[in-house]
Design a protein with these regions (language model features):
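Positively charged n-region of N-terminal signal peptides that target proteins for export
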Residues: 1-9
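Compact, glycine-rich, soluble single-domain proteins
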Residues: 26-159
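Sec/Tat signal peptide C-region and signal peptidase I cleavage site
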Residues: 21-25
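Bacterial N-terminal signal peptides
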Residues: 9-20
Length: 159
């Protein structure tokens, strides 16, 4: 009986540890190891306005990697943008080129900075639902991420 109890404790701990990392996706290719953390998107009002998606990319590899693009079937035109603010405080979003994720570093795609624009939505982003998105990297790596949709006014993965 004692052996069964200890086995159940170990299994329970393992399950809890697995659940704590469920929001992180990992992909390895040689010396490259990318971890995706806390992907999320805001709910949209229909399909007439673009949607936004956010996440963090951690490079646990030994060499820099570049995020070069993405695909998302929910959007006819998905791209990475950067919010830039001029000296007068006026902000605008501009397409970003390839974005470096330094070896051992993290790239945050978040409101007011780099972010994913989902233009020409094929269906609305509905709170509580998810959608798949594929990230494209300079080394040819493609990584699919499942993105949960949060409330329309969300400012972070916590809502």
């Amino acid at each position: 009986m004692r052996h069964i109890t200890n086995t159940l404790r170990c299994l329970s701990f393992g399950l809890l540890m697995g659940l704590s990392t469920v929001s992180a996706a990992q992909e390895n290719a040689g010396d490259i190891k990318i971890v995706v953390e806390q992907p999320w998107a805001r709910a949209s009002i229909g399909t007439s306005r673009p949607g936004g998606a956010y996440l963090a990319l951690r490079n646990e590899g030994d060499v820099p990697v570049y995020l070069v693009g993405l695909r998302a079937d929910i959007s006819a035109m998905a791209s990475i943008h950067e919010t830039q603010t001029n000296d007068e405080g006026v902000s605008r979003m501009v397409p970003a080129g390839d974005i470096e994720i330094p070896a051992g570093g993290t790239l945050a795609l978040e409101p007011g900075s780099y972010h994913i624009m989902l233009m020409k939505l094929q269906s609305p982003l509905v709170e509580g639902e998810t959608f798949p998105m594929t990230l494209l990297f300079s080394d040819g790596l493609e990584m699919e991420v499942v993105v949960p949709v949060l409330r329309i006014g969300a400012r972070s993965p916590e809502g």
